[in-house]
Every structure is written in structure tokens, then in C-alpha cells.
From Swiss-Prot:
Highest taxon, organism lineage: Bacteria
Described function: Flagellar protein that affects chemotactic events.
Gene that this sequence comes from: fliJ
Protein name as it appears in the record: Flagellar FliJ protein
Membrane topology label: Peripheral membrane protein
Gene Ontology cellular-component annotations: bacterial-type flagellum; plasma membrane
Length: 147
């Protein structure tokens, strides 16, 4: 008699859900990394711009150039603020996806444990049935020999 886990279809469904959650988590990690990279790039641009402004101030800078730099820094600050908000949002999404993935992993592990226990019970029952059958055969052989 072959072993058949009674919740196999449910286990497969849970595994599919886990795989889907893993895919969504990986996607959210990728999105978070992309947004964080954009934030870093913009912060680096601002730092470079500030350094260039300092150099130009020492060597002399027109009022027009100063306004231009100030406008550019202001725009960069707005962009940086936007990306900071996005980073926070993407981090929260990533954390939510990670929690969901953890829950799905736990569900799958429960079913795998259940399958393992059920298989052990099946193996024990099968072994007991086999031993009983062997005992029956031994008794029949003993009886046939005329004892």
C-alpha cells in the first residue's frame, strides 16, 4: 500500500502561495534598492554641487551664478525629499512582504511536519500489519506441519 498524504493538495497550494510571496518580496527588495540608489545619487549630486559652489565662491562668483546654484540646490532638495519619502514607503512595503513570506513559510512547514508525522504513523502501521501477516503465515505453517 502506497503512502498518500491526505492534505497533499493543500500543501501544494500553500507552497505555491509561498513561492508567490517570495517573488513579491524579491520584487519589493529590488524596488527598494532602486529607490535608495536614486536617493544616494541625488545626495551625491548635491554634495558635489555644494563643493563646486564653495570653490567658485573662493575664486569669485557672479550673483546670477549664485542664484542658479541656489535654484539647482533647491530643486535637488525637493528631489531628495521625494526620494526619502519613497525609500520609507518602499521599506515599509518590503517589510510587509517579508512578514507575509515568513507567515507562508510557517504554514508550509506546518504541513510538512504534519506529512512527516503522518508518514511515520503510516510506516509504523504498515510494519505492524506486515508483522501480523508474518505471524499468521508462521502459525499456518506450524499448523500445516501437524503440531
Amino acid at each position: 500500500m502506497a503512502y498518500q498524504f491526505r492534505f497533499q493538495k493543500l500543501l501544494e497550494l500553500k507552497e505555491n502561495e509561498k513561492d508567490q510571496s517570495l517573488s513579491e518580496y524579491q520584487q519589493s527588495v529590488s524596488e527598494f534598492e532602486n529607490v535608495a540608489e536614486k536617493l544616494y545619487e541625488n545626495m551625491s549630486k548635491k554634495e558635489l554641487l555644494e563643493q563646486n559652489k564653495e570653490k567658485k565662491l573662493k575664486s569669485g562668483m557672479s550673483v546670477q551664478e549664485m542664484r542658479h546654484y541656489q535654484q539647482f540646490v533647491s530643486n535637488l532638495d525637493n528631489t531628495i525629499y521625494h526620494y526619502q519619502k519613497l525609500v520609507i514607503m518602499k521599506r515599509n512595503q518590503m517589510n510587509q512582504k517579508q512578514e507575509i513570506l515568513t507567515e507562508k513559510n510557517i504554514e508550509v512547514k506546518k504541513f510538512e511536519k504534519m506529512r512527516e508525522k503522518q508518514f511515520k504513523m503510516f510506516a509504523l502501521e504498515d510494519k505492524a500489519a506486515e508483522m501480523k501477516e508474518m505471524d499468521d503465515i508462521s502459525i499456518k505453517q506450524f499448523m500445516i506441519q501437524g503440531h
